[in-house]
A protein has these predicted regions:
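Acidic/polar, glycine-enriched structural segments that form the non-catalytic walls/loops
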Residues: 1-102, 143, 174-193
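Aromatic-rich carbohydrate-recognition surfaces in CAZymes
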Residues: 103-224
Length: 224
């Protein structure tokens, strides 16, 4: 016996999950499982096909495209199709343009490699990420050093969004407000660590000893 199951996911509410299911799955594909499979295959072929490698070594090609898939799969959408999302203060917010979805992304040292890959082959996703980061800053007044579930975790001592936003800008991705981004990032870099009222930490963890000594002495911070 064949059993078909469809599910919708929302970080906002049940109505959002139903709407996401309707617009992203039920309306375009109905109960046709093969249509879903073929669409997923088509989408991924388009992304993976943006880089063409030449080699007679099948295993090398398999390794390359498998890891390219893993690198691109790291991003996730945190807003609903109607543009609603839950911000750092657990408030339901509404994007002016639902297409400017709130995108989660790994910050920790990925500006060296993964983010540059996005800038080169999927600039539209880098653009969404930058606009998302700026939107969240405008909501809470702070950029996030390493978000988890759109929260100010404070687990990262550095300010990697600077490198990621600047990297996107230098790659020609400029459909976001750099002036707003600059003001927010400057504020973050010049503020000692403090608790955020909605939970978590904002500011630069080791700013105080660095401003006093010009470096971070052993025992004065988590790193030296």
């Amino acid at each position: 016996e064949e059993v078909l199951v469809r599910s919708g996911v929302s970080l906002v509410d049940m109505a959002g999950a139903r709407n996401n299911l309707k617009q992203e799955l039920a309306d375009p594909f109905g109960w046709d499982f093969e249509k879903v499979v073929n669409n997923a295959r088509s989408v991924w072929n388009e992304y993976l096909g943006r880089i063409d490698i030449e080699t007679d070594d099948y295993l090398q090609k398999k390794k390359f495209y498998t890891n390219l898939y893993r690198a691109l799969a790291a991003k996730a959408t945190w807003s609903d199709v109607d543009g609603r999302f839950v911000d750092e203060d657990e408030r339901i917010r509404q994007l002016e343009k639902p297409g400017d979805c709130i995108v989660s992304g790994e910050y920790w040292n990925t500006f060296w490699n993964n983010q540059q890959l996005f800038n080169l082959i999927t600039p539209e996703i880098s653009s969404q990420w930058a606009r998302s980061a700026i939107q969240l800053y405008q909501n809470s007044g702070w950029f996030n050093t390493d978000p988890a579930g759109i929260e100010h975790t404070g687990v990262m001592v550095a300010m990697h969004p600077i490198s990621q936003i600047l990297g996107a800008w230098q790659s020609g991705i400029r459909d976001f407000d750099m002036h707003v981004a600059y003001d927010g990032l400057k504020k973050m870099m010049l503020t000692p660590p403090q608790k955020y009222e909605g939970g978590g930490t904002v500011g630069v963890e080791n700013l105080v000893p660095y401003m006093e000594y010009g470096y971070i002495p052993a025992g004065k911070g988590t790193v030296s």
